[in-house]
């Protein structure tokens, strides 16, 4: 099912480039996703190797679910950082709640996919209008602002070297985002991390011990929900309130999923939400997310960076994305490579996080502006105000065995208020 393309494609979805050209194009997609994909596990303290492996496997799962008809790459999701970090903190560093929560989020995707298949999409628009999505994104973005500032060393007892590295990293990312041209502008995270890392190295803040100790070939450091006799670390499937609090993030990520596929459809001149259909794209995304979390990785999501590469190169070949997934899987087994990534100082991550969390929050405002949410309507002011204060103010609501806080409480509050508050009659 086709529509008019906004880009004159050199290679369509079902076409393939020559072998040599194809490898170069695939590496270009790897570079595009790399900075963001490794940043999430670094912030969360997860093995980078698992995130790379899961992104590659997740992309292949997505392609199988969609019949290899959509050129989408799946990488680590920023949206879950706040909720997963809080779950780990509340569990004393144990990842059980965080991983179980993301596994269940994948199941939520599957349930929504089934509902879309049999009931259409109108109920999504009714349940999740922009007045809920916008404040939710703001809460997600600002929820970990304090940790970003701490990692950056911008605190009373902070080290000036760390603060300087964080500022330099932030400025590199900011200038690339505003002044970068072409492909450079698509990979600001990667260049900012490299620039910040080199600056930290010059200040003596990098320890290469992990690289020297690592083997050239290593199996990714999977975390699994069962015993492997010590071969891999273990977590438990945990279904407490810390786990349930992660599920509402799906509200935002499903909306992002729809938006990404809409943009990609316009670039490729296809209607991917109809063929293969939203139910199949959600199914692939959901299964990929559950598999990633099962292995000890972060949630997966569709990557706008790779959509940008398609728009820039005018090559929408699914085979190029598929091979990029295989490259990511191969990189996850290079022990010294993943060990080198683990030596990136917290100050670099802090500088990136300040920009990242701020951009996420600002995108929440962008949703409200783009969708022209009428704040002349008192009901909209009330919904947004309640969501922001409860989501960022540390509010906790205990309902029997279930405890709601942060993004979960914010989401539930917004949904309920949107359903019960009447619209004003301006006449």
Outline where the language-model segments fall.
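Membrane-embedded alpha-helical modules
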Residues: 94-207, 323-427
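Interfacial segments of multi-pass membrane proteins
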Residues: 85-91, 177, 306-321, 327-332
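Re-entrant/interfacial helical elements at transmembrane boundaries that shape
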Residues: 38-43, 73-86, 259-268, 299-312, ...
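Membrane-embedded helical hairpins/re-entrant loop segments and their flanking transmembrane helices
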Residues: 9-19, 45-63, 245-318
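Intrinsically disordered, low-complexity non-transmembrane regions of multi-pass membrane transporters
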Residues: 1-24, 208-232, 266-273, 281, ...
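N-terminal signal-anchor module of multipass membrane proteins
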Residues: 1-74, 78-94
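Juxtamembrane interface elements at the cytosolic ends of transmembrane helices
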Residues: 6, 34-35, 169-179, 187, ...
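Hydrophobic, membrane-embedded alpha-helices of multi-pass small-molecule transporters
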Residues: 20-36, 161-169, 187-188, 219-260, ...
